[in-house]
Amino acid sequence: MINDVSRAQIAIWDKLSNISVSKKIGSAYLFTGPIGSGKETLALKFSQLINCENSLKEICYECSSCIKFRALQHERLNIVVPLPTPKSASSDGIFPKEYFESIIAKSEDPFYKIAIPKANRILIQSIRALKKKLYFKYEKDSGRNIVVIFDCELLCSGQGESGNALLKLLEEPPDRTTIILVTDHKKMLFETIISRCQNIEIPTLSNEYVYNWLIENNSSNSEAEFLVMICRANIHRARTLSRQPVEKLINQIEKLATTVVSKDSEKWRNFISHYSRLFGTNHLDFNHHLNLITIWMHGVNKLKQGLNSGFENTGLQPRMISFNKKFPKANIFEVILCIEDVKKHARQNLYMPLILLNMLIDIQKFVYE
């Protein structure tokens, strides 16, 4: 199965399998690496393996534990994700219906990215509820409690109270408990958290794996080749880009690129208004559209350096050539950094209209001056 990321990350899976066989399972691991490299899937599979009733080396997929883990419904599995701020400080009722829907979606598609609207941080209430559950005594004293924390850098958002609460768990973990933190942004974590975890560095997926995944998920050969070129080994990006026809995707890229280099104040107002609202309701779509601008800029920069843009057989190639002729001194590298800064500020929950305005102003400076 192409969805089995352990086949794409053989060296990492062998390392995790050896940990299971040794029975020297740590109390805390930190899975880090590039976006879309399969970290979440590997964390869940490792959790399934160390609770498998029939094997220490490979997941059997047949025992009751494996079946429950595959459905993400095992009583010893605790999945922590960013959630919207609740109306009260109590840990009761903090999970919106989108959380449960997302868990089901994740069980059906390992590359599904959980992104609940208005969920900007990991709540202190989630960590408090977790502590209560981890100290619960099971009648059947087998298996291991597993905590998997996705987007764990958001433990440290705001005043970092959730990160500090988790730190106490890491310092004095309950018996037979393993906490797996998963992040694309290791540098945003407290050093005290990092130092208490065994680091598992996940490399990027191969282009061959992403290509085969796209083919298995109904992309044509030409579409898969094009998407592999622009998704940069990010399986989440490949998944998102493959949801729409390539022609529509190309038109969207051109429209966004034209807007951010435009001097039309009305286009600016519409852009800032639309994407500020989108940021508040759907972080994944917000990042997706920023990525489309970055894709355009990377193509322009490659042409500038005499390389293939990846858009040779599309209508974007002539427009990119025209862009380079019109703006021969444009600093494309700095433009890309401007867009990446917006994504970084988005993770810090800063005021988005001002962030987007500053981005547009900076892009003008690096393109026109």
Regions found by a protein language model. Name each.
Residues Q125, A129, S142, E161-A165, ...:
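Residues forming well-ordered secondary-structure scaffolds
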Residues M1-L49, K57, S64-S65, D175-T178, ...:
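Charged, glycine-rich active-site and insertion segments that engage polyanionic ligands
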Residues Y135, G163-D175:
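Conserved catalytic/switch belt of AAA+ P-loop NTPases
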Residues I146-F150, L166, T177-T183:
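Structural recognition of the conserved hydrophobic beta-strand(s) that form the central parallel beta-sheet
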Residues A71-Q73, P173, I193:
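Short, structurally constrained coil/turn elements
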Residues L154-S157, E172, M188:
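Residues immediately C-terminal
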Residues I2-E161:
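Clamp-loader machinery-focused feature within the broader ASCE/P-loop NTPase space
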Residues K132, K168, S195:
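Conserved adenine-binding aromatic site and its adjacent loop/helix in ATP-hydrolyzing domains
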